[in-house]
Amino acid sequence: KLRNYIIDGGFDAVVCVHLFPAEAMTAIRRNGHKDLPTIFVMTDYTCIPFLDETELDGYVIPHEHLIEEFAKRGIPREKLHPLGIPIGREFQHSNPKMEARRKIAESYGWDISPWKNWFLIMTGSMGYGSTQEIIDETINQSHDKTEIIAVCGRNEEMLIKLTEDNKTRKIVHPIGYTDDVPLLMDACDVLFTKPGGISSTEAICKSIPII
């Protein structure tokens, strides 16, 4: 089905950002369909397992220092292109912190202090992780001298539970999936998150410390 979709779609090239489609495209190409250029874009700062099973035209990797690692895993050097991890343009410029905080407070209708330390908790688009434990420990350490924004992604159950469990804590602000991550990074002082390649790159560009 994928092969027919690609052939019938009139595409000029295929770009894979995950191992599974890269493996699928390898199988299609081994069956004789090598005329469509296929590129893999690595979104982790390491060579992931099983990437050496793929046979594509090119591999975009995060940095030239990783060329040796990928080459040792069997990826031909001539196919390695150290161009970095792509991120959205909105992460490549920053808003002044106080301006970002004002925009966030207005957008979400929060009564939130711009003078405290703001902590941002993000556990991925699916909202996995021990967010409540992070909230509890942060409050214990900071003694209410902070504002905590917890992004639950598409995990509605987590959003409901965090909202209910923290309803008496005015400094905790759970939200669901949002497109405001660039602005939230500008507004906050520290980011608690999983160490994904893309989110780490976004945070680096926004100059926000990661825990």
PLM segments and residue spans:
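Structural loop-to-beta junction motif characteristic of Rossmann-like glycosyltransferase folds
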Residues: 189-190, 207-211
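A nucleotide-sugar donor-handling region in carbohydrate enzymes
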Residues: 57-125, 154-155
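Donor-nucleotide binding loops and adjacent catalytic segments primarily
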Residues: 108-188
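Short alpha-helical segment that forms part of, or immediately flanks, the ligand-binding pocket
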Residues: 182, 200-206
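Active-site and donor-binding regions of nucleotide-sugar-utilizing enzymes
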Residues: 1-74, 79, 88
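Short gly/ser/thr-rich secondary-structure transition/capping motifs
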Residues: 39-44, 172-177, 193
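Acidic donor-binding loop of glycosyltransferase active sites
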Residues: 186-196
